[in-house]
């Protein structure tokens, strides 16, 4: 196997180097240990999470995982930081314009959590490459992309691998972060992106066609945008969230990313089936109780 390649021969940027001796994880992440317990914090520090799409939602999810002391992160995105990203993406600054999103996010994470190993994949997920993009060592995936076909393929792969996945719905046009919901992707309403993904999962990946039948896949989503939300131009109103699509605000994109990160950690820390140990605490979404089954085996829209 060539240097800098994974088991599939796919090139990956190397994880960062050894940690500086002055780094004190117990001091830096003591609050995480008090919240999740010593055993939970140790499991987080040993876990491998994948964030697919490092933009308005994914960048905040990666930030949250790093600030919880995650052991390894794989960041997947081919995009570069643009000025239009500054309103909603944590890595978008005047000093980072034009730089690779995964590169600047990796540098930020190194400053937050030096012990976190970061693998950078400069690529977009497609139907053809998804199997080689998601590493076999992953413990959970956060899907923060907005292309329905690729999103469905990623979800289907995770389900086939019994890999927990948390799916993020559309954030464009939403203004209220407290309107976020958590449910099975089959139960999400008012989200055109997830509706399109559901249709593809049923048509292309043999997901249940019966109305109301759960997919066993968790989604974080928000109802349809307010009537005043506008796309950049007529004819673009169906776009979920892009520079030329609906307007967006960081209060919603960050909240969705944080919720996805919380659910990803809950999936990582959930006891194996048959265990009597209680799951770590987790906040419920406003107006919607947590579903009976969440991202324990896979997730997607």
Predicted regions and their residues:
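Conserved SAM/SAH-binding loop
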Residues: 121-129
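N-terminal charged helix/coil linker that caps or initiates catalytic domains
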Residues: 1-50, 83, 286
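Conserved N-terminal Rossmann-fold NAD(P)-binding element of oxidoreductases
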Residues: 51-53, 76
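Hydrophobic/small residue at the entry helix of a nucleotide-binding pocket
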Residues: 57
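Short amphipathic alpha-helix with an adjacent loop that forms part of the alpha/beta core around
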Residues: 128-138
């Amino acid at each position: 196997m060539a240097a800098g390649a994974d088991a599939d021969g796919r090139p990956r940027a190397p994880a960062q180097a050894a940690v500086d001796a002055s780094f004190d994880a117990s001091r830096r992440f003591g609050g995480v240990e008090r919240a999740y317990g010593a055993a939970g914090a140790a499991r987080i520090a040993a876990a491998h999470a994948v964030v697919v799409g490092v933009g308005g939602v994914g960048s905040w999810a990666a930030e949250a995982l790093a600030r919880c002391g995650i052991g390894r992160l794989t960041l997947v995105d081919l995009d570069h930081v643009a000025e239009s990203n500054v309103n909603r993406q944590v890595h978008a600054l005047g000093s980072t314009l034009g730089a690779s999103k995964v590169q600047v996010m990796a540098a930020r994470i190194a400053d937050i959590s030096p012990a976190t190993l970061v693998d950078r994949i400069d690529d977009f997920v497609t139907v053809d490459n998804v199997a080689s993009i998601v590493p076999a060592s992953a413990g959970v995936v956060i899907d923060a992309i907005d292309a329905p076909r690729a999103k469905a393929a990623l979800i289907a792969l995770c389900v086939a691998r019994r890999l927990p996945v948390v799916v993020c719905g559309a954030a464009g046009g939403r203004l209220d972060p407290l309107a976020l919901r958590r449910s099975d992707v089959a139960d999400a309403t008012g989200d055109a992106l997830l509706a399109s993904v559901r249709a593809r999962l049923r048509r292309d990946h043999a997901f249940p066609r019966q109305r109301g039948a759960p997919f066993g896949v968790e989604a974080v989503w928000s109802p349809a945008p307010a009537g005043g939300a506008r796309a950049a131009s007529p004819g673009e109103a169906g776009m979920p969230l892009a520079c030329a699509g609906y307007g967006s605000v960081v209060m919603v994109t960050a909240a969705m990313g944080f919720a996805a990160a919380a659910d990803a950690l809950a999936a990582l820390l959930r006891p194996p089936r048959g265990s009597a140990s209680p799951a770590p605490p987790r906040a419920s979404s406003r107006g919607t109780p947590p579903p009976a089954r969440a991202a324990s085996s896979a997730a997607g829209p």
